[in-house]
Design a protein with these regions (language model features):
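Alpha/beta catalytic barrel-like cores
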Residues: 1-42
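Active-site-proximal beta-alpha core segment in soluble small-molecule metabolic enzymes
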Residues: 73-156
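Gly-rich Lys/Arg/Thr-decorated short loops/hinges at beta-loop-alpha junctions or inter-strand turns
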Residues: 36-43, 87-88, 112
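Anion (oxyanion) recognition and catalysis
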Residues: 66
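A generic alpha-helix structural signal
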Residues: 55-58, 62, 131, 154
Length: 156
């Protein structure tokens, strides 16, 4: 459902000017080394996550969904974190929900195959790309992209 090696590779990314909270003095570090520096070395505003609390919440939601027979496709667009998506998939999520073609490309780069689009693609190039992905996504079903009725549509 995703490529574990690609997801792990995120931690090896070298931090630079593209990373908002990284002071110039810390650029050049790998992301995996950056996390242990402590909050005092980071620029604000900055959002941090408590790994233990995140794990507890992810497990609670996964268990709740499983007990009720619910297939969960959490919003990946909120975090844009392949590592978090992988954790959710490992805990039983059916797939990941995204909002646009750029977000779909990120997910496909990391090998995610069960993706739900919570929007309509209107750009012809994005539609062609998505159709190509649907035909080649490893581990996907022919329904990788599904048409769902729109509440605004007169014909379903």
């Amino acid at each position: 459902m995703y490529d574990p090696a690609r997801v792990r590779s995120v931690g090896e990314e070298i931090l630079d000017f593209r990373h908002k909270a990284v002071p110039a003095a810390l650029q050049g570090l790998r992301l995996v080394d950056f996390g242990g520096l402590g909050l005092g070395r980071l620029q604000t505003p900055l959002l941090t996550l408590d790994r233990d609390a995140l794990d507890v919440n992810a497990r609670l939601l996964a268990d709740w969904c499983e007990e009720r027979g619910i297939l969960l496709a959490p919003h990946g667009k909120t975090t844009m974190s392949p590592e978090l998506w992988a954790r959710q998939m490992d805990l039983g999520a059916w797939g990941i929900t995204l909002a646009n073609a750029a977000q779909l490309r990120v997910a496909r780069h990391f090998g995610f195959t069960r993706l739900m689009l919570a929007n309509s693609l209107t750009d012809p190039q994005a539609i062609r790309w998505a159709a190509e992905q649907a035909s080649t996504a490893r581990g996907s079903s022919p329904g990788w992209i599904r048409r769902t009725p729109s509440p605004c549509s007169t014909s379903n």
